[in-house]
Structure formats: C-alpha cells, structure tokens
Amino acid sequence: MKQRSILWQAAGFALVTFGGTILHFLYDWTGGSILVSPFSGVNESTWEHMKLLFWPLFLFALVQRLFFRDQENYWCVKLAEILLGLVLIPVLFYTYNGVFGKSPDWINIAIFYITALLVFLFKWWMFKKDFLPCKYPRLALAAICLIGVLFVVFTFTPPQIP
C-alpha cells in the first residue's frame, strides 16, 4: 500500500505540473480562445497562476477517486490539498516580491512547482495519518466545485480590488 501511495503522489505531481505548464500557454496557443480562458492563464496575475494549479489538481482528483473509493476522507483531504495550494501560491509570490522587490520568471515557475510538490507531500501525509475525519464528503466536493465556478466567473468578471 505504501509503494502504491508513493507512486500515486509521484504520478499526480508529474501530471499536475505538466498540465499546469500546458495551461499556462494554452490561451496564447489558441489565439485567446474564450473556450480555454476559464481553465488557462489569460494573463500573468497571481490569480491566473492559482488556476493553473487548481484545474489539474481537480481533474487528477476525479480520476484518482475511481481508485480510492474506500478512502472515506478522500474529498476532505482533497479540499485541504487544494486550499493549501491556493494559499501557498500568493503567499510565496508576495513574500518573495516583498523581500526582493520583483521576481524573475524562473522564480514564478519555481513557486508553482514547489507548491505542487508541497501539496502532494501534504496529501500523502494526510492519507498516511488518516486523522482528518470527514463527516460531510459531499460538502467538501461541493466546496471544490464552488472554487472551480469562482475561477470561471472571475475569469470573465474579475473583482475590482483597490
């Protein structure tokens, strides 16, 4: 079981980082297609980079769930994993920029990959410890879906933050 879990985490990390990298360029590759804009990065904002992590994590979660049906706390762990990733990207980005003033592109790329690695290590640890009780897995899944809806809505109508 331990080897199976490590293989899942490694495969997930590879697929999520590959998917996020593809999504980073997909909008430009399609000539700014409105069909891919909810899922891909339409500009270089931190928000758009959070989408690049969210969508591959969500798709991988749907596939992985088919193989982890016996994991009762699955969706709660997935929600915690996604929330951690969505918090880490802006925290790491703004911390780096706050300290050094500006971040080169390679730092932004490193932040994405480091965040992906940390969320997969976190998820592996959460499943291994099995201490996150999940009384309402459907609510956790609904929260994940709501995050996806917010990414779509805010892609087309971003909030005006002063």
Segments from the language model and where they lie:
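Hydrophobic cores of alpha-helical transmembrane segments in multi-pass inner/ER membrane proteins
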Residues: 51-64, 113-124
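Alpha-helical transmembrane segments of multi-pass membrane proteins
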Residues: 15-32, 152-159
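N-terminal membrane topogenic signal
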Residues: 1-12
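Terminal transmembrane helical module of multi-pass membrane proteins
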Residues: 127-162
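Small-polar-interrupted transmembrane alpha-helices in polytopic inner-membrane proteins
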Residues: 20, 24, 60-61, 77-94
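Membrane-interface helix caps and helix-loop-helix hairpins in membrane proteins
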Residues: 71, 95-106
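Short aromatic-rich membrane-water interface segments that cap or initiate transmembrane helices
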Residues: 38-51
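Hydrophobic alpha-helical membrane segments
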Residues: 85-89, 108-124, 145-150
